[in-house]
From Swiss-Prot:
Part of the 30S ribosomal subunit. Forms a bridge to the 50S subunit in the 70S ribosome, contacting the 23S rRNA. The lineage of its organism: Bacteria, Bacillati, Bacillota, Clostridia, Eubacteriales. InterPro entries: Ribosomal_uS15 (IPR000589), Ribosomal_uS15_bac-type (IPR005290), uS15_NS1_RNA-bd_sf (IPR009068). One of the primary rRNA binding proteins, it binds directly to 16S rRNA where it helps nucleate assembly of the platform of the 30S subunit by binding and bridging several RNA helices of the 16S rRNA. NCBIfam families: S15_bact. GO terms for molecular function: rRNA binding; structural constituent of ribosome. GO terms for biological process: translation. Keywords: Ribonucleoprotein, Ribosomal protein, RNA-binding, rRNA-binding. Gene3D superfamilies: 6.10.250.3130, S15/NS1, RNA-binding. SUPFAM superfamilies: S15/NS1 RNA-binding domain. Belongs to the universal ribosomal protein uS15 family. It comes from the Bacteria. HAMAP family: Ribosomal_uS15_B (MF_01343_B). This is Small ribosomal subunit protein uS15. It comes from Clostridium botulinum (strain Eklund 17B / Type B).
Length: 87
C-alpha cells in the first residue's frame, strides 16, 4: 500500500481531516493490508512468516471491531457494510 492509497483511505473513513486513530480508519487500513497480503500468499503458498503476520493482523482487526461494536453499534454496522466484511 503506497502513501497515496493510505491517505485516500484515511480521508474516506476518518471522522475528521488527518484522523488516523479512530477505529474505522485503523480497521480500513488493516483490511487493505490483509487483502494485499492474501493475494501475496495465494502466489507464495510456503511463505509461513507472512502467514503469521496475516493472522496477527486479522486478530488485531477483530479486536478493533469488537471494541467498536461495544462502543457504537451503528458505526460498527456502517464499517462492516462499507468494507464488505462478514460477521
Amino acid at each position: 500500500m503506497d502513501k497515496a492509497r493510505k491517505l485516500e483511505i484515511i480521508k474516506q473513513y476518518g471522522r475528521s481531516e488527518g484522523d488516523t486513530g479512530s477505529p474505522e480508519v485503523q480497521i480500513a487500513l488493516l483490511t487493505e493490508r490483509i487483502n494485499s497480503l492474501t493475494g501475496h500468499l495465494k502466489v507464495h503458498k510456503k511463505d509461513h512468516h507472512s502467514r503469521r503476520g496475516l493472522l496477527m493482523m486479522v486478530g488485531h482487526r477483530r479486536g478493533l471491531l469488537n471494541y467498536l461494536a461495544d462502543q457504537d453499534i451503528e458505526r460498527y454496522r456502517t464499517i462492516i457494510k462499507q468494507l464488505g466484511l462478514r460477521r
